[in-house]
UniProtKB/Swiss-Prot annotation:
This is Uncharacterized 11.4 kDa protein. Residues 15-24, 71-81 have a biased composition (Basic residues). Residues 1-24, 49-99 are annotated as: Disordered. It comes from Streptomyces fradiae.
């Protein structure tokens, strides 16, 4: 029994590729289709109506910038215990500063 191809390949002769393009319209621009004129345009919606967006009046002003270089090291601390100011002694007897 011969296997038949059910779907036609785009490279096959006589097959045209269809592109579905969604036209976006600007605020105040009337759509070409009559039935689409009753639908509201997204451009008409005020920006403040979006719930996730923070209004500029409520946002804290960014007047101060964080320092470029922080004295703290980033990442996890080496140990959770409190570090002493005393120098830490290694087994070899070499003194390293505990910072």
């Amino acid at each position: 029994m011969k296997a038949t191809r059910r779907t036609r390949v785009a490279s096959e002769r006589g097959v045209r590729r269809r592109r579905r393009v969604r036209a976006t319209r600007k605020a105040g621009e009337l759509p070409v289709k009559v039935w689409a004129r009753t639908l509201p345009s997204a451009a008409w919606d005020p920006v403040g109506s979006v719930r996730t967006q923070v209004t500029p009046s409520r946002a804290a002003p960014r007047t101060c910038q964080p320092p470029a270089w922080s004295s703290r090291r980033r990442g996890r601390p080496r140990s959770s215990r409190a570090r002493s100011t005393e120098p830490a002694w290694s087994p070899e007897g070499v003194v390293r500063c505990a910072t």
